[in-house]
Amino acid sequence: MRALAGCLLAVSCASFAQQPGDVVVTATRVDQPSLEVPASIDRVYAEEIREGRPQVNLSESLGRVPGITVLNRQNYAQDLQISSRGFGSRSTFGVRGIRMIADGIPASMPDGQGQASTFDLGSAERIEVLRGPFSSLYGNAAGGVINVITEDGPAVPTLEMGLYGGSYDTWRGALKFGGQWGALNAVGNLSRFETDGYRDHSAAQRDQLNAKGRLALGDATRLTLVATSLRQPDTQDPLGLTAAQVAQNPRQVVPQAIQFDTRKTIEHDQAGATLDHALSDATRLQASAWAGSRFVEQFQAFSGATPATASGGVVNLDRTFGGGALRLFNDSALGGRPLRFSAGVEVERMAEHRQGFVNNNGVAGALRRDEDNVVSSTGAFAQAEWKFADRWSGHLGVRSTRVAFESTDHYIVAGNPDDSGSKDYSATTPVAGVVFRLDPATSLYANVGRGFETPTFVELAYQNPPASGLNFALEASRSRHAEIGVKTIRAGAYRLTAALFDIVTSDEIVVDQASGGRTTYRNAGETQRRGLELGAELLLTGPFEARAAYTYLNAEFSDAFGAVAAGNVLPGVPKTQFYAEAAWRHAPTGLRVGAELLYRDRVAVNDVNSEFADAFTVVNLVFGFQQQGSKWRLNEFLRVDNVTDTAYIGSVVVNDANGRYYEPAPQRNILVGLQASLQF
């Protein structure tokens, strides 16, 4: 894509030239150096994603990104909890508040719900993370954008195999093949991951396929096809623990998890196509379409047989989704100075058949819920960048979004009325920014904007008993963002970033109650997030490499509501977080020795701030070797996580009604891996 964009946008190459050592980004929808983007944006490269890492969870590689907190639940039934500047911390499963994208195709549903497990890290070329108000140009995402880009196939057809195993009967095997055949470039990755889990009743299996093909249809047109598939059968859910249970035995599970055999099965398939066509040297048109299906069966930690309005303790969800987008990109001039413009329209739709059954101790029983749900999203955006002076550029953008929810109830019996209903949410979200180039390697920037985030269908799914049906009383949250920052990239030396931000959100969507795998939500009043993000990376060509990320985030409720006092901190959000990584390579022997350190401040587990998960520091060590010939390469690694055997809480279940807030992280554990590649 970068090579194509370079040709298509050649008219302004001189004006928008990339500085040495700079980073080209695509999360703003337009390829350009990060020094020219008035926003916080970071990239994690393939080597950083895969070298000495299991390539299963985003928590392995996103710790190095300031402003991002990834809480690894060690619970593959509920996926990671990812938050950006505190957005998404309310999620009891999956990802919310952050737009997930894979190869330009949405990995989030139209309602904003996303699953990090659908990303294939084994074939990722890079991960781009955008934070701040420019994410509003993607619509239903107030916190940011995570964009995973699959690598292209190598110039020479190459077969790559990987295998690792370690503690808790964990193993992963992968097979990847790719290459260039005339006008076609393709790559595919197939993997299986299995683990018994650190905790009892936490076994998981994940089979994953990711494929990408790119076909040049002449000099001006390129077609990209992508497909992904995920199978995750009978993934056990250990649920959370109380503080007393953690102190007694952090690996245990509560009796309800065994009694009701809490577990989840996921089947996810998705495919998409993007056609990129140069209308002229200065203008290109991009059209995308995608479609997919998702099946979920979840056994929760209760029967759900009573009262009459109960929805059961087994969720059966059959979903189809799809959409399309048309985008125009143009480079021209205004007042004799470069002007870059983009605009587009996007349409998405998701339809699901949701049923609920009584959980008869791990076996689905009588039907207690039956409904069809549809959510559709339409949006239009426009964005412009104008270099109005030699060292100044201004950025303006706006998006109009409408998200419509509709539910048709088919389970209408005595004591359980017709709960059909519908609700629409809409917003226009502007954003503006300015960049000043202090010198060729340093830029100062500022931005302001508005954000918009609707409830997801999962958040609308339940009301507190005895009420039934969807919770259409939930409103969308709306936010105002302001940020200033500095970036400097010195080729062959270092990369430094700093950002200060202030965010005020009204009608914040918060957890009301969470119990047995079921969660209800409500709107709070106003919240405020103020923070500082710092990033540093050495870009030396010698044997040493190092990087660090620091986040300070004061996220609190400005207004009291219910039993929650004004000034309480948002649950699931650490006030400070620090990550550091250093490595040394010895080229003659292929040896690499690395160390990672993560410090995370204490985290509130509920809105009333009555309990906290303690702060912790964890150290990991990695040892690797590499051998290679003219057509082959071999890599081995030994990874020791939590070297000091620290007891800590990896994630929390926000506002759990039973006080089971805590999800303990593993003790010291080891992985040994081998990777081989062969060119043909």
Give short role names for the model-derived ranges:
Residues 58-61, 81-85, 98-102, 115-117, ...:
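N-terminal periplasmic accessory domains that precede
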Residues 89, 97-98, 105-131, 473:
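Short acidic/polar hinge/loop motifs at secondary-structure boundaries
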Residues 158-160, 165-194, 199-237, 263-284, ...:
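Transmembrane beta-barrel wall of Gram-negative outer-membrane proteins
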Residues 215-216, 228, 384, 446, ...:
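Conserved C-terminal beta-signal and adjacent last beta-strands/turns
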Residues 222-230, 265-412, 437, 490, ...:
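Face-selective signature of the C-terminal outer-membrane beta-barrel domain
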Residues 233-247, 349-360, 404-413, 422, ...:
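Surface-exposed extracellular loop regions of Gram-negative outer-membrane beta-barrel proteins
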Residues 276-278, 284-302, 437, 443-449, ...:
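Membrane-embedded beta-barrel scaffold of Gram-negative outer-membrane proteins
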Residues 327-330, 390, 495-504, 522-606, ...:
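Gram-negative outer-membrane beta-barrel transporters
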